C-alpha cells in the first residue's frame, strides 16, 4: 500500500472512531434522559397523591370550622330570640320559670 492510501485509511479509521464515540455518548445521554423521565413519572404520582391527601385534610378542617361558625351563629340567634321573647313576656307581666341555685 502506498503512503497516500495508508493516510486515507488512517483518516477514515479516525473518523469511524469519532463517530463510534459520538454514538456511544448519544446512547449514554439517551439512556440517562429515559431514566430521568421514568424517575419523574414515578415521582409525580406520589406528589399528586400527597397533594390530594393534603387537600382532603384541608377541606375537612374547613368544613369543621364552617360547622363551628354556623353553630356559634345559631347559638347567638337562639339567645337573641330568647331574650326578645323574655322581654315580650315581661311587658305582658309574665315571666319564665327559672330555678335559682
Curated annotation (Swiss-Prot):
Keyword Zinc: no
GO biological process, alphabetically ordered: flagellated sperm motility
Tissues in which the UniProt entry reports expression: Expressed in trachea multiciliated cells.
One GO location term (cellular component): axonemal A tubule inner sheath
Subcellular locations according to the entry: Cytoplasm, Cytoskeleton, Cilium axoneme; Cytoplasm, Cytoskeleton, Flagellum axoneme
A Pfam match: CFAP141
Source taxon at top rank: Eukaryota
Keywords: Cell projection, Cilium, Cytoplasm, Cytoskeleton, Flagellum
PANTHER family given in the database record: C1ORF189, CILIA- AND FLAGELLA-ASSOCIATED PROTEIN 141
Function per UniProt: Microtubule inner protein (MIP) part of the dynein-decorated doublet microtubules (DMTs) in cilia axoneme, which is required for motile cilia beating.
Quaternary state and interactors: Microtubule inner protein component of sperm flagellar doublet microtubules.
Name by which UniProt lists this protein: Cilia- and flagella-associated protein 141
Organism: Bos taurus
Amino acid at each position: 500500500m502506498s503512503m497516500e492510501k495508508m493516510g486515507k485509511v488512517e483518516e477514515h479509521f479516525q473518523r469511524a472512531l469519532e463517530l463510534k464515540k459520538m454514538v456511544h455518548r448519544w446512547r449514554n445521554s439517551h439512556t440517562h434522559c429515559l431514566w430521568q423521565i421514568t424517575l419523574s413519572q414515578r415521582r409525580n404520582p406520589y406528589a399528586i397523591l400527597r397533594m390530594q391527601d393534603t387537600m382532603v385534610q384541608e377541606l375537612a378542617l374547613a368544613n369543621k370550622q364552617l360547622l363551628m361558625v354556623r353553630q356559634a351563629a345559631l347559638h347567638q340567634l337562639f339567645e337573641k330570640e330568647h331574650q326578645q321573647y323574655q322581654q315580650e313576656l315581661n311587658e305582658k307581666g309574665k315571666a319564665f320559670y327559672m330555678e335559682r341555685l
